[in-house]
């Protein structure tokens, strides 16, 4: 599997020369540096992204401007949002930081102290320079690629196939968001220290380096302090124990004890200080909702694998209904078994990659699927793909020779090679930069919200926002960051991109019909899980507003809600807005007995926004 030599007796063809040059580069001693540099170059558009989406919310926290005080030191508070205290949740619902349908036990607090520390340093050193914050993230991504390259070479040897795996990992467009989005930097840190842990563990168990026994536990602790994504390391350690460790079985599992103790200590701290999530359908806590978590794993796992292996993004899992899983999952499983079984049967390293990749799906199954979660899944997938391609090219005799396997396998192999080695690196800069128009789609309309000082004595009501997390929360966050007046509360009559019908019942009341249900869209279930449903007839009272559920959809929650205000809807204390063609414009409530309809948010508004730039 080393780089092949050119035949000195005959002049080699152009393709053979290119092949020789490529494989020679893939065994270069400085390949880790080369690939780290390549990864930075492909993700350089991140330097011009600025702050986007969650970044604005993190800015309010790190600058001490957030209306929510987590109780943690600012240095560690970037990922500790809502603590589940019912009084605090009610106060934030009154302000509009949380919508009226929020679970009273809503909690999102992540034990990401190391990642938070890196963000705190950004705001201490260059608070007004987002480009330097992005450069900081890109350096972490470069370090991650270098660490992955060293790990592939240590596990697979100095052959060109290890270099190919590292190249596939470095240019994977699934890594765009972790590299480009400041709020997702925690994934880079978790993967960086996690891969260092695996490298050190192999150095201890196979190479006999005693200092690595301590190093792998230290790296595991740092990975866990960076983000929950690092739990995937446990899956790879188990896979290593089963397939790569050559000692007696009892010694293999005994060697896992130091890492197990680190995981146990982390878990005790995590649960003792109430980290984690509760009441949210966007994040599913496996300890609180085990059945829902297993259901999510079955639904989301295939889409996560789809996002890793194919050009289709894992985000498809947010828009395709569960019934399609009954068809899609067996087909995907059959494809992987068909393609990889001969390799898995013959090669223990391939078995290590496969099991590590599969087990790394578990920690991310509790989150809405997305390519940004695939840093550990990709580690095993790219190792497998490199071995598959090298076997098809160099040692076809190791695989079945019958046309019924070889022709489809070669076809799929060529497709995967073209996608991952050509299309993916070409797309990576564009996927990185796509975060900017996505962020501006939600942030730019905030400029159309009035800066009149009177608004500080008014309640702002948005009747049809595209969603709540970014549309409504960014109004308050951006106004606070810009030092401009902000409404005393912000309300939304719906929380997703769905058609509405609003009927005026009397001077103070509206009936809102939400076609399909309130909890639609990517973030529809963020604030309330299916295990804690709203009920028919339930009424929630906030300061200046009550909401009563008058019709329900079994899957997507309230289909009809009656809103009642303590004053007539035309009162000067209320300021009404509607979302129209990518911007906010004034809305006049209809006369009593009359209705007004809104179509769902046009997805092309994202590309053809007519609001201010």
Cite the ranges covered by each PLM segment:
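Intrinsically disordered, polar/acidic, low-complexity terminal segments
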Residues: 56-60, 321-328, 345, 400-613
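Polytopic membrane enzymes that build or remodel cell-surface glycoconjugates and lipids
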Residues: 2-478, 545
């Amino acid at each position: 599997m080393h780089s092949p030599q050119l035949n000195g007796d005959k002049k080699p063809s152009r393709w053979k020369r290119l092949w020789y040059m490529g494989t020679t580069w893939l065994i270069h001693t400085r390949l880790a540096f080369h690939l780290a540099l390549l990864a930075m170059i492909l993700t350089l558009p991140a330097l011009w992204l600025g702050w986007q989406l969650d970044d604005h919310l993190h800015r309010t926290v790190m600058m001490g401007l957030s209306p929510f005080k987590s109780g943690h030191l600012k240095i560690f508070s970037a990922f500790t949002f809502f603590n589940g205290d019912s009084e605090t949740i009610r106060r934030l619902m009154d302000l509009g930081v949380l919508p009226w349908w929020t679970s009273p036990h809503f909690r999102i607090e992540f034990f990401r102290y190391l990642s938070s520390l890196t963000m705190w340093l950004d705001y201490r050193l260059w608070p007004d320079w987002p480009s330097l914050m992005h450069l900081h993230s890109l350096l972490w991504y470069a370090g991650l690629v270098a660490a992955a390259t060293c790990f592939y070479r240590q596990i697979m040897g100095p052959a060109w196939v290890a270099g190919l795996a590292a190249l596939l990992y470095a240019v994977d467009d699934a890594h765009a968001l972790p590299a480009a989005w400041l709020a997702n930097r925690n994934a880079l840190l978790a993967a960086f220290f996690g891969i260092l842990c695996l490298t050190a563990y192999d150095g201890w168990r196979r190479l006999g380096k005693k200092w690595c026994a301590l190093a792998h536990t230290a790296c595991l602790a740092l990975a866990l302090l960076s983000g929950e994504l690092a739990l995937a390391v446990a899956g790879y350690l188990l896979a290593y124990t089963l397939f790569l460790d050559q000692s007696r079985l009892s010694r293999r599992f005994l060697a896992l004890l130091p890492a197990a103790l680190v995981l146990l200590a982390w878990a005790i701290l995590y649960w003792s200080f109430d980290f984690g999530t509760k009441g949210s359908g966007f994040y599913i806590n496996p300890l609180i909702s085990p059945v829902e978590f297993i259901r999510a794993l079955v639904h989301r796992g295939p889409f996560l694998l789809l996002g890793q292996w194919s050009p289709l993004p894992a985000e498809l899992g947010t828009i395709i209904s569960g019934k399609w899983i009954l068809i899609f999952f067996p087909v995907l499983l059959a494809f992987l078994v068909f393609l990889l079984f001969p390799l898995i049967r013959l090669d223990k390293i391939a078995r290590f990659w496969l099991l590590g990749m599969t087990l790394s799906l578990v920690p991310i199954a509790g989150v809405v699927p997305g390519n940004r979660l695939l840093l550990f899944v990709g580690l095993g997938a790219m190792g497998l793909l490199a071995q598959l391609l090298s076997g098809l090219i160099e040692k076809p005799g190791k695989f079945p020779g019958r046309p019924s396997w070889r022709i489809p396998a070669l076809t799929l192999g060529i497709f995967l090679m073209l996608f991952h080695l050509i299309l993916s690196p070409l797309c990576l800069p564009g996927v990185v930069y796509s975060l900017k128009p996505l962020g501006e789609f939600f942030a730019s309309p905030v400029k159309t919200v009035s800066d009149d000082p009177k608004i500080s004595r008014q309640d702002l009501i948005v009747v049809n926002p595209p969603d709540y997390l970014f549309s409504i929360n960014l109004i308050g966050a951006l106004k606070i960051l810009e030092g401009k007046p902000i409404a005393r509360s912000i309300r939304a009559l719906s929380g997703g991109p769905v058609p509405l019908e609003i009927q005026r019942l009397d001077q103070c009341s509206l009936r809102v019909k939400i076609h399909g249900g309130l909890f639609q869209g990517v973030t529809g279930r963020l604030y309330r899980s299916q295990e804690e449903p709203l009920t028919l007839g339930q009424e929630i009272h906030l300061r200046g507003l009550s909401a009563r559920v008058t019709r329900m959809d079994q899957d997507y929650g309230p289909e009809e809600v009656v809103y009642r205000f303590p004053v007539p809807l035309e009162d000067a204390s209320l300021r009404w807005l509607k979302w129209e063609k990518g911007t906010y414009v004034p809305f006049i409530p209809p006369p009593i007995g009359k209705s007004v309809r809104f179509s769902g948010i046009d997805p092309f508004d994202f590309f053809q926004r007519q609001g201010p730039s």
